[in-house]
A protein has these predicted regions:
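Active-site beta-loop-alpha junctions of metal-dependent nucleic acid enzymes
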Residues: 112-114, 135-157
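Structured nucleic-acid-interacting core domains from mobile-element enzymes and related host factors
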Residues: 43-118, 124-125, 244-249, 260, ...
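Charge-rich, intrinsically disordered regulatory segments
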Residues: 4, 12, 21, 151-158, ...
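Short, positively charged, Gly/Tyr-enriched micro-motifs
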Residues: 1-44
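Surface-exposed, charged/polar loop-rich segments
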Residues: 50-76, 183-248, 254
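Short, conserved catalytic/metal-binding motifs centered on acidic residues
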Residues: 16, 105-109, 130, 165-168, ...
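Conserved beta-strand -> loop -> alpha-helix junction used to position metal-binding or nucleic-acid-contacting
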Residues: 34-37, 129, 133-135, 164-171, ...
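Core residues of folded domains in eukaryotic genome-function proteins
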Residues: 15, 28, 70, 82-84, ...
Length: 598
């Protein structure tokens, strides 16, 4: 039915009806009303009632049988009720091998009718596009759930834990990361913290002093500089005893850029990339989805995301940006970087012409230089370049290369003055190049496993699946490559048939089918997430809210209604006190269970 296709595209029911009216020439020619569409949608959702979780597990296990690189695991509670799961496919696992140095993790809600929490692991590829490494569904946001999810993520990724992970300030998640990723640098989302200043400071203080606090946070190059600037800003604003600011200062090692600028972050300092990913996926999914509906729509969104990456790969392979100068380094890097990173490098190279280099000191081991802008203002500060002569290494105080992986304008100015015409390989980060995805990826740690036959078969299948997938990605970028690989597949397929006829096929028994499961999986309960509850109203909003109106006397804001209004005649119906209290509870709700005051 066309309505089901509209629903899969996340077209609201009211808009579906308008489209049917336009197609039919008016509402009188449609043959049904909007209520009929809603009833049909409900009947489709009811088809999965009671078997939704089991259908989801069956689907994932069938995916695992079709592709041995697909990873999936789940857990149930003591009542065999579905509580959490994690999944990732071969494309995401291979992407993690190339781009898994930095991971952004953030949870979101309203993606399925059970309220299960959607928890994707995302990163950034060589085109600076958001990519998915894996996903989880959780029934709660407790430490145990996060520990389970992070362990499954680690189990799926042969590359190991990321170097850096960016999250919000959730204490349960923070504890879980310290347990599962003890060597990973954990950073809090800077954007979220900066946005809280307007809530935590009174309006006058925020207006007068926020800019100086923000400058201390964003423009400090070292931890000493930040602490000095922060202390001055707190003193000027008389905020030394502010509880929240004191807490944030104690946590400064987890969110202030000065403490992280030496750690590669792929240019990210917040979880906004994860939140933009949430917004992208929510264009395809809704809170009414069953688990299977969610997965079907999620996969459609994922295919769209990966198509954009293939388009960018195609552009890099078949289009060449126009050179802006005759500097040899420019013609070198235009063939190395992806278009996105090339444009960033070009901007740095263009800006480098506005800087001059001043020698401070040169010794046997180090050379110290100041790099200053020709049009430097009194507020701008020079950058300090350190040249380590022994290894011919260049370090700039702006730390852009360490943080983003792109040589800064100060380094390029130094190279130009010293007639370095080609960028040394040590300053070319492979993850930003067109060859970034040319990496080895083997999910098994033992190439020559001598174990049970089914393990040997699985090991061989994993390796061949990866190589075939990598070839398909490369060949599909061009028509010629597609035709060539297709012909080679036909040739190899015939050779494999002949080979298997003359060779003993070694392997093991088939994996147990999901339908052989001993105990049925129960659908998850509707989950009340920590963000639920009635919205807390400000005192101003409460003051302007109108009270109850008695329909007997017409007065508003009184403590009675028509049933016990004193202005009515003696024959009026008067209910007892218990009924009145029951009515009040129904109108206003109770604090316990319906409001989250924490």
């Amino acid at each position: 039915m066309l309505s089901q296709q509209f629903a899969e595209a996340n077209v609201p029911t009211c808009q579906q009806m308008r489209l049917f009216e336009i197609e039919s020439g008016g509402p009188e020619h449609v043959g049904f009303i909007e209520r009929d569409i809603r009833n049909y949608e409900q009947s489709v959702r009811d088809e999965h009632k009671g078997i939704d979780a089991e259908t989801l597990v069956d689907f994932f296990e069938s995916e695992k049988e079709k592709n041995s690189l697909f990873f999936f695991d789940y857990e149930t509670d003591s009542d065999n009720r579905f509580t959490r799961c994690f999944w990732t496919d071969h494309v995401s696992r291979r992407a993690y091998t190339a781009f898994g140095d930095v991971v952004v993790f953030d949870t979101t809600y309203n993606t399925n009718k059970y309220g299960m929490i959607f928890a994707p692991f995302v990163g950034v590829n060589h085109h600076h596009q958001t990519i998915l490494f894996g996903c989880g569904l959780l029934s709660d946001e407790k430490t145990d759930s996060f520990v389970w999810l992070l362990n499954k993520f680690l189990e799926a990724m042969c590359q190991g834990a990321p170097n850096l992970i960016i999250t919000d300030q959730d204490p349960a998640l923070t504890k879980a990361i310290s347990q599962v990723f003890p060597r990973t640098t954990h950073r809090y989302c800077l954007w979220h913290i900066l946005n809280k200043f307007s809530e935590k400071l009174n309006p006058m203080t925020f207006r007068d002093h926020y800019e100086s606090i923000r400058n201390a946070i964003l423009h400090s190059s070292t931890d000493e500089e930040f602490e000095s600037s922060w202390e001055a800003a707190m003193s000027n604003a008389n905020l030394e005893q502010h509880d929240w600011l004191s807490l944030m200062f104690d946590l400064r090692h987890k969110w202030v850029p000065a403490y992280f600028n030496h750690v590669f972050s792929a240019g990210m300092s917040s979880s906004q990339r994860s939140e933009s990913s949430h917004a992208f996926f929510k264009r395809y999914i809704s809170s009414k989805n069953s688990l299977m509906d969610f997965i079907i729509r999620f996969n459609k969104a994922l295919r769209h995301q990966r198509h954009n990456e293939l388009v960018a790969d195609h552009v890099d392979m078949n289009e060449r940006p126009k050179l802006q100068s005759k500097w040899p380094m420019e013609s070198q890097m235009v063939t190395v970087y992806t278009k996105k990173k090339w444009l960033e490098f070009l901007e740095e190279m263009s800006q480098s012409h506005g800087y001059y280099v001043q020698t401070e000191s040169v010794g046997n081991e180090f050379g110290i230089y100041k790099v200053m802008n020709f049009q430097a203002s009194s507020s701008s500060k020079p950058r300090v370049l350190t040249h380590v002569i022994q290894g011919d290494d260049i370090l700039c105080s702006c730390m852009k290369f360490q943080f983003e992986g792109i040589p800064c304008r100060h380094m390029l100015a130094f190279f130009r003055i010293n007639q370095v015409f080609h960028l040394p390989d040590k300053y070319i980060l492979k993850r930003w190049t067109q060859a970034a995805k040319n990496v080895e990826f083997f999910p098994t740690d033992e190439p020559n496993v001598v174990e049970a036959p089914e393990r040997c078969l699985m090991s061989r299948h994993l390796r061949l699946s990866y190589k075939a997938s990598a070839l398909v990605d490369i060949a599909s970028l061009t028509v010629e490559g597609t035709n060539f690989l297709n012909a080679q597949f036909d040739y190899i397929g015939n050779k494999m048939k002949d080979l298997n006829m003359t060779t003993t096929v070694s392997g093991g028994s088939q994996c147990r089918r999901a339908t052989d499961r001993a105990v049925d999986i129960v659908d998850p309960q509707k989950i009340r997430t920590k963000g639920c509850g009635k919205r807390l109203k400000s005192s101003k909003e409460n003051a302007t809210t109108q009270g109850r109106k008695c329909r007997g006397c017409g007065r508003r804001g009184v403590q009675h209604d028509k049933r016990n209004c004193p202005n009515l005649q003696d024959g009026s119906t008067i209910n007892n006190k218990n009924e009145e209290e029951s009515s009040d509870d129904e109108d206003f709700g109770s604090i316990d269970g319906s409001n989250n005051w924490i």
